[in-house]
UniProtKB/Swiss-Prot annotation:
Predominant cellular place of this UniProt entry's protein: cytoplasm
Annotated InterPro entries: AsnASE_II, Asp/glu_Ase-like_sf, Asparaginase/glutaminase-like, Asparaginase/glutaminase_AS1, Asparaginase/glutaminase_AS2, Asparaginase_C, L-asparaginase_C, L-asparaginase_N
Native organism: Helicobacter pylori (strain ATCC 700392 / 26695) (Campylobacter pylori)
Gene: ansA
Binding-site positions, substrate: S62, T95, D96
Subcellular location: Cytoplasm
Similarity comment: Belongs to the asparaginase 1 family.
Entry protein name: Probable L-asparaginase
MF terms in GO: asparaginase activity
Length: 330
C-alpha cells in the first residue's frame, strides 16, 4: 500500500520540534536533540498519508540559523522539487527565525509544488507537546493539491500562513504565529485543509532571485533598533563594519531622531542603501518628505524580513528606485 502513496520530502533543521527536556512539566529543554528518525517514529499515522523521504539538513536551535544552512537547505529543497516523484517538501524548523527562513525560501525557490515550514513551541517531552500534530498537519497541507502555487507556507497551531506575512508574536504561546496585516490564508484541522485567500505578492516562480546565481556570503545588511534618546553610534558601527545596507527599525511609522536622520542621510549619499521599517508589529511604512529618494520604505515587512529582501536585492542592484520597486512587489 505504501508504494502507492504520494511521496513527501521531509527536511529537518532542528529546533524545539526536535527538542527534548528532562521533565514534562518544566519549560527548560534543549533544541535539536532528536533526529529525523525519532521525529517520524513518534507519528506513525504519517505513514498512512504518504511515503516520507526524510533527510537531516542540520540539527540546531534556530537562533543559530545562518546563510550557510539557508543555502544548503534551499539547494536540497530545489533538487527535491525538481524530482517528479516528489509531491511536496516539508521543512521542520525552530520558531525563533522560522519567518526569516520561510521568506528567504519564498524568494529563491522555483517551483509551484508545496513547500511547508513547520515548528513547535513545546518540546517532544513536554505536557501537551504541539510538534506531532503540527507536523502531521504540515504533511497534510503539502499533500493537498490546492497548496500548489501559493509560495512557501508556514503551518502552526492549525493555521496556514503565507511566508511573507507570518511573524512570531509571543515568546511561549503555541498560537504565537500570526499574520497581523493580512490574516492566515487557510486552516488545517487534523489534516483537513481549507483555503480562504491567495498570496498576491511575487514569490517562487515569479521571483527574479535565482538560487543558481546567488553566492555566500550575501551582501552584509544590519538591523538597527531605535529608541527614545537614540544616537547614531550603533549605526556608525554598522557602517564601519562595511555594511552594504542597513534596515532601521524605527519608532512608529519608521521614524528616527533628528541627529540619527542626519547620519542616515550622509550614509545614503555615500551609497549605503537604507530601508526604513518599524519596531511596531503591524502596519505599513508610508513614504514622505523624510525619504526624498534617499531611503527605501519597507511597505509592511518587519525589519527581519526587510533585511532578507534587501540582501537579495543588493545582489542585483544598488539603485534605490529599483530596490523600492522590489519592496512593493515582493
Amino acid at each position: 500500500m505504501a508504494q502507492n502513496l504520494p511521496t513527501i520530502a521531509l527536511l529537518a533543521t532542528g529546533g524545539t520540534i526536535a527538542g527534548s527536556g528532562a521533565s514534562a512539566s518544566l519549560g527548560s529543554y534543549k533544541s535539536g536533540e532528536l533526529g529525523i528518525k525519532e521525529l517520524l517514529k513518534a507519528i506513525p499515522s504519517l505513514n498512512r498519508l504518504a511515503r516520507i523521504q526524510g533527510e537531516q539538513i542540520s540539527n540546531i536551535g534556530s537562533q543559530d540559523m545562518n546563510e550557510e544552512v539557508w543555502f544548503k537547505l534551499a539547494k536540497r529543497a530545489q533538487e527535491l522539487l525538481d524530482d517528479s516523484r516528489i509531491q511536496g517538501v516539508v521543512i521542520t524548523h525552530g520558531t525563533d527565525t522560522l519567518e526569516e527562513s520561510a521568506y528567504f525560501l519564498n524568494l529563491v525557490l522555483r517551483s509551484t509544488k508545496p513547500v511547508v515550514l513547520v515548528g513547535a513551541m513545546r518540546n517532544a517531552a513536554s505536557l501537551s507537546a504541539d510538534g506531532a500534530l503540527n507536523l502531521y498537519n504540515a504533511v497534510s497541507v503539502a499533500l493537498n493539491e490546492k497548496s500548489a502555487n501559493k509560495g512557501v507556507l508556514v503551518v502552526m497551531d492549525d493555521n496556514i500562513f503565507s511566508a511573507r506575512e507570518v511573524i512570531k508574536t509571543h515568546t511561549t504561546h503555541t498560537s504565537t504565529f500570526k499574520a497581523l496585516n493580512s490574516g492566515a490564508i487557510g486552516s488545517v484541522y487534523y489534516g483537513k485543509t481549507r483555503y480562504y485567500m491567495q498570496p498576491l505578492r511575487k514569490h517562487t516562480t515569479e521571483s527574479e532571485f535565482s538560487l543558481s546565481q546567488l553566492k555566500t556570503p550575501l551582501p552584509k545588511v544590519d538591523i538597527i533598533y531605535t529608541h527614545a534618546g537614540m544616537t547614531p553610534d550603533l549605526f556608525q558601527a554598522s557602517l564601519n563594519s562595511h555594511a552594504k545596507g542597513v534596515v532601521i527599525a524605527g519608532v512608529g511609522n519608521g521614524n528616527v531622531s533628528a541627529g540619527f536622520l542626519k547620519a542616515m542621510q550622509e550614509a545614503s549619499q555615500m551609497g549605503v542603501v537604507i530601508v526604513r521599517s518599524s519596531r511596531v508589529n503591524s502596519g505599513e511604512i508610508t513614504s514622505g518628505e523624510i525619504d526624498d529618494k534617499a531611503f527605501i520604505t519597507s511597505d509592511n515587512l518587519n525589519p527581519q524580513k526587510a533585511r532578507v529582501l534587501l540582501q537579495l536585492a543588493l545582489t542585483k542592484t544598488n539603485n534605490k528606485e529599483k530596490i523600492q520597486e522590489m519592496f512593493e512587489e515582493y
